[in-house]
From Swiss-Prot:
Similarity comment: family membership: Belongs to the XseB family.
Protein name (record): Exodeoxyribonuclease 7 small subunit
Pfam families reported in the protein's UniProt record: Exonuc_VII_S
Annotated SUPFAM superfamilies: XseB-like
GO cellular component, one term: cytosol
NCBIfam families named among the record's database cross-references: PRK00977.1-1, PRK00977.1-4, xseB
Family matches, as InterPro entries: Exonuc_VII_S, Exonuc_VII_ssu_sf
Organism the protein comes from: Serratia proteamaculans (strain 568)
Molecular-function annotations in GO: exodeoxyribonuclease VII activity
Length: 87
């Protein structure tokens, strides 16, 4: 009998960037309130780190997709590498 993927794996993949960001903002608010017991705060922090990493990965994937689409464009315009700190 084939193994089913872990529930958390399939859940993580199906969660949208926006819902992850919303959950992360909620976690930050609860942590900043200072009212959580230590164990709960650590659990929330751990989940927040996980969400932040997932969000960063999704953003990187989106950036790569945009670069691929722009590189495949017919006008062959020169692209400047994306630098998030540039203004």
């Amino acid at each position: 009998m084939p193994k089913k993927p872990a529930q958390s794996d399939s859940t993580e993949q199906s969660v949208s960037f926006e819902s992850s960001l919303s959950e992360l903002e909620s976690i930050v608010t609860r942590l900043e309130s200072g009212e959580l017991p230590l164990e709960d705060a650590l659990n929330e922090f751990e989940r927040g780190v996980q969400l932040a990493r997932q969000g960063q990965q999704k953003l990187q994937q989106a950036e790569q997709r945009v670069q691929i689409l722009l590189n495949d464009s017919a006008d062959d315009a020169a692209l400047t590498p994306f630098t998030p700190d540039a203004e």
